[in-house]
Amino acid sequence: MKVIDQFKNKKVLVLGLAKSGESAARLLDKLGAIVTVNDGKPFEDNPAAQSLLEEGIKVITGGHPLELLDEEFALMVKNPGIPYNNPMIEKALAKGIPVLTEVELAYLISEAPIIGITGSNGKTTTTTMIGEVLTAAGQHGLLSGNIGYPASQVAQTASDKDTLVMELSSFQLMGVQEFHPEIAVITNLMPTHIDYHGSFSEYVAAKWNIQNKMTAADFLVLNFNQDLAKDLTSKTEATVVPFSTLEKVDGAYLEDGQLYFRGEVVMAANEIGVPGSHNVENALATIAVAKLRDVDNQTIKETLSAFGGVKHRLQFVDDIKGVKFYNDSKSTNILATQKALSGFDNSKVVLIAGGLDRGNEFDELVPDITGLKKMVILGQSAERVKRAADKAGVAYVEATDIADATRKAYELATQGDVVLLSPANASWDMYANFEVRGDLFIDTVAELKE
């Protein structure tokens, strides 16, 4: 990692632990900062805080006392999940204390070039595809960021022979200043996380931070299926490389069942190892990045053909007596579920949907769920999802939790059917995250098979 001294002897407050906060605290300590960690979880239930304290890092747990900010901190590094209307963050900003996320730290110390991937849907799959293609080409793509590996941790061991392939959420991108990828990808932009950002325009602005420091020597890969992406083209200094499944573009595109890059066939769409129209878009974005990094077509084709998907994103779980189970717990919004359903015959699908109520109706989902065999509905948003099912003429049953929903869906299915968990909602009404929800689905399927 690069040796930097800008944090040496500076007082830094790390707000919120989890993986990224813990990694940031250790990195800042290594860089010579005077670190204080503040986390809301009680100390006795907080192994990360206990470990940091043993290493000599100051830890304050069990709440977020505003008087902590009476100290003169030079910087705050916040967990990306903590909203900016948190009183601690509001007070820090009012005092002129910069508030960053650990993604910024990763950029500052990284010897490796960075490819950043953001968007509303497809981030994890596209990030994984890019990482696998680059690694197959000998460029060693290191996955990091929102994909589960703290960027500031991975960056510490990356060399200039590696490439950091970083999945970036809007939450993370709100906390960057100097962050500068050589290639950035925005998979798509849809209204989501409005409860965090306040409006769609603010959400887009957060995503757009990915390109703030890019120049004409850098590449911004945009989805030209969306007019919004086309409109944004004039607002960046970066060189835009488009991808599209709807039209021929000066980049990566779909035509007559083939995936092209600038007029050259790379592979057939039906050779991609995972189903669904959304995965064609993900593959096109990957092809654009790979070609910009001089990866040959054969390597791209072989890697994407062998690609098995990622956990919780249209993940095939098992087959029980001819009923196939798919875990798409990562589909936390309407568009993601629409794309998941596009890969199946609705008449053979029992869909499990519902979760955190963000106040939105599901009318957009009605055409996509029409013709489903059945639905199993759960969660805070159940009443809203039921209204959409009624409009689509789909029969449904209600469930109390994911285990109950999985069992009921199996009872409704017959040989040749698919049980699809694709909630179109976040998990936080019942579960800590979509991974927990998906793992419970997987565990219940295993129990059903016994």
Curated annotation (Swiss-Prot):
Pathway this chain belongs to: Cell wall biogenesis; peptidoglycan biosynthesis
GO biological process, one term: peptidoglycan biosynthetic process
Pfam families for the chain: Mur_ligase_C (PF02875), Mur_ligase_M (PF08245), MurD-like_N (PF21799)
Subcellular compartments: Cytoplasm
Presence of the UniProt keyword Oxidoreductase in the record: no
Keyword vocabulary terms for this entry: ATP-binding, Cell cycle, Cell division, Cell shape, Cell wall biogenesis/degradation, Cytoplasm, Ligase, Nucleotide-binding, Peptidoglycan synthesis
Gene Ontology CC annotations of this record: cytoplasm
InterPro entries cross-referenced by the UniProt entry: Mur-like_cat_sf, Mur_ligase_C, Mur_ligase_C_dom_sf, Mur_ligase_cen, MurD
Statement: the UniProt record of this protein carries the keyword Transcription: no
Signal sequence interval, chain numbering: none
EC number from the UniProt entry: 6.3.2.9
GO terms, molecular function: ATP binding; UDP-N-acetylmuramoylalanine-D-glutamate ligase activity
Binding residue positions for ATP: G119, S120, N121, G122, K123, T124, T125
Enzymatic reactions: UDP-N-acetyl-alpha-D-muramoyl-L-alanine + D-glutamate + ATP = UDP-N-acetyl-alpha-D-muramoyl-L-alanyl-D-glutamate + ADP + phosphate + H(+)
Function: Cell wall formation. Catalyzes the addition of glutamate to the nucleotide precursor UDP-N-acetylmuramoyl-L-alanine (UMA).
Cited HAMAP family: MurD (MF_00639)
Family recorded in the similarity comment: Belongs to the MurCDEF family.
PANTHER family given in the database record: UDP-N-ACETYLMURAMOYLALANINE--D-GLUTAMATE LIGASE
Protein name, UniProt field: UDP-N-acetylmuramoylalanine--D-glutamate ligase
Species of origin: Streptococcus pneumoniae (strain CGSP14)
